[in-house]
């Protein structure tokens, strides 16, 4: 069962690509959005906040010096995360978009961080 429509999924998936390619309206606008969604992965920057885009999402399991830009979505019946991820050594630079519409995925707080770390490790092997 799809809780997020296909058009919305495509828009969420295109969002980080348009930012990376500076095509989100204009280069200046894209750079502005990138700064708005830039996330500090050091735990002291997010750990004590009641709502943050790191804990239980794609950034939680990544090294703290990773460049991380993310836009999350979370409702009562789904979670999604769209992120631009750059390793500290710049060997890995990729976009990861994950939708968790099934109950077992959107209720599992470990799924997104585990998946993210596995993708990160694989990207570093290239």
Outline where the language-model segments fall:
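Penicillin-recognizing serine hydrolase domain
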Residues: 1-126
């Amino acid at each position: 069962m799809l809780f997020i429509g296909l058009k919305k999924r495509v828009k969420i998936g295109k969002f980080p690509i348009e930012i990376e390619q500076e095509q989100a309206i204009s280069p200046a606008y894209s750079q502005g959005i990138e700064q708005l969604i830039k996330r500090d992965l050091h735990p002291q920057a997010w750990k004590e906040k009641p709502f943050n885009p790191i804990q239980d999402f794609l950034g939680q399991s990544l090294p703290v010096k990773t460049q991380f830009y993310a836009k999350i979505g979370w409702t009562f019946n789904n979670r999604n995360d769209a992120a631009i991820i750059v390793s500290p050594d710049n060997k890995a630079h990729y976009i990861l978009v994950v939708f968790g519409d099934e109950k077992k995925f959107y209720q599992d707080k470990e799924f997104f961080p585990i998946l993210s770390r596995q993708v990160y490790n694989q990207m570093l092997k290239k």
